[in-house]
Amino acid sequence: MIRLIMKNLWARRRKNGWLLAELILVSIVTWVIVDPLVVLTHDRNLPEGYRPDHLFLLQLASYPAGSEQFRAEENDTLARKANFERLLNKLKHYEGVKYTTFILNEQYPSALSISNGNTMFDTIPVRTLRLAFIPHTDYFRTMGMEGAEGMTAEQLDNRDFLWTESVLTADISQRLKDGKPLYGRRLGNGDEEDYRVGGVIAPVRYRSYMQPMPIELYVYEEFPDYMYYYIPLIALRIDDHLSEKVFLHHFREWMNKELTVGNYYVKSVQSFSDIQEQHEFSEGITNQYRLNLALGIFFLVNLCLGVAGTFWMQTRSRREEVGIMLSFGGTPSHITRLLLYEGW
């Protein structure tokens, strides 16, 4: 049978050559379409390192001096501080809210802005994204981050961090390639103050469509007075059993009445899930994913139809040959195997 197969292939070498060229071309085009789709799907299914579900972002603002709602007696630092604390207290005691925290410098996962730099381990630089947090503000539990190297988010929230300490993501240890734990390691290049790693968290995907990137979270020891004027964002986490849409509907009605304190008011509130979707759409990731998915399905269907059609045309054009083989005692199963082996 093998000898007969080789003779048949050689006799149809020109036609089979065209078929082979078509298959190679289709395979290349399909791979160009499928490869980014597979990579993006893989990256999207990696652990995020934080929980965007049931997490909301509030943007506060203050009335300008020319506004009708502006109150001059509430505009000094002491009044702003008191009003800010009243607003936070109302927010923390709203039904369904578990944790609240500050988002400093408008930098958070899926934010448009990025701050990066080098985290030095003696003479070894590691490129990191840089975020900031204030200790004892439930930052890690609010964001849903996971501790690493034996730490928990609760322990990190309750720890008395110094301004010379940083929290690093665990994937930085892979960049150092020395197998040593990160916690307690000295930072800097040897001629600076004693900076150290005060905590370690699981790797975080700063972009929902990318793999985790090394992150350093540095410490603000206290809430500085200038932030009562340059107001930070506020993140809040609600109970897991609550519906985000229902909560947001009732919360917006409540905040318009109750969260206007002094010259402060809530400018907007948005879920982190919506922030992720909007960022992916603005970066063209959503359109790219949909386009590649549609083209991938289109080419896959056409590839299956092409293979089936080619097999049908080949067998139809060889009916006379099949009839001759049957007349010489060939069985249908033998002829079927012959055609399949030729295709293989």
State what each model feature region is.
Residues P125-E216:
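Hydrophobic secondary-structure segments that place a key small or acidic residue at a functional site
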Residues A170-D171, E192-Y289:
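"Rare, low-scoring activations can occur
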Residues I2-K7, L305-G343:
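Intracellular coupling helices
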Residues M1-S67, E321:
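Alpha-helical transmembrane segments of integral membrane proteins
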Residues P36-R127:
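Membrane-proximal extracellular/periplasmic loop immediately following the first transmembrane helix
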Residues R13-V38, G284-E320:
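Hydrophobic alpha-helical transmembrane segments of multi-pass inner-membrane transport and secretion
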Residues S67-A82, V126-R130, D160-W163, P203-M213, ...:
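Solvent-exposed, non-transmembrane alpha-helical starts
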